[in-house]
């Protein structure tokens, strides 16, 4: 069991919530680290997303993080990474999710350069089905990008990290926006209200990158790129 509050990195063999045995770190993001774990209660492998220490003192963020994860747990769909559990163990806040063996769409695009229209269409259909399922439950992703889309070894496409972006405070947005700003909707760039249409815009940018191998707007910093989404016209992918 975890004994020290704010453990910066979980060690192999640690047990979370007297149930999930940490087997190793498999990824990291702006706000959380991801570990492969064994669920000893249901005897299956899972992914455990653990909040980074710098966000564990932000009580407003913690509250939103939990409520959004609980909302996302309602979603069960073949094109969504399903959430199984959420909680905290002695100050370590975690989300337990379906473990997907595969790579992100971002990694796949980087490897291939750009995708054929046929392949991009197949991926796009699966992503849109996952988003439609979420939107029909009133859940908006708010951070749709290739890094949050996973392609499993058997070719199934799944959208990950529902609700986590919404929980982010302005402080966490600044930290994690480096990869996200290229896919941000104009209303998000403006700092205004965003809804399901924001996801569709970000999904459109993702589709653009699939067929061209690049994002439509580049810049020296996040502000420059965000302004481009507000003010500039996207060049047709050809």
Q: In which residue ranges do the predicted regions lie?
A:
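C-terminal lobe helix-coil module of Hanks-type protein kinase domains
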Residues: 182-238
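Activation-segment/catalytic-loop signature of the eukaryotic protein kinase fold
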Residues: 86
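Protein kinase catalytic-loop region centered on the HRD/HxD motif
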Residues: 127-139
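AlphaC helix of the eukaryotic protein kinase fold
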Residues: 52-74
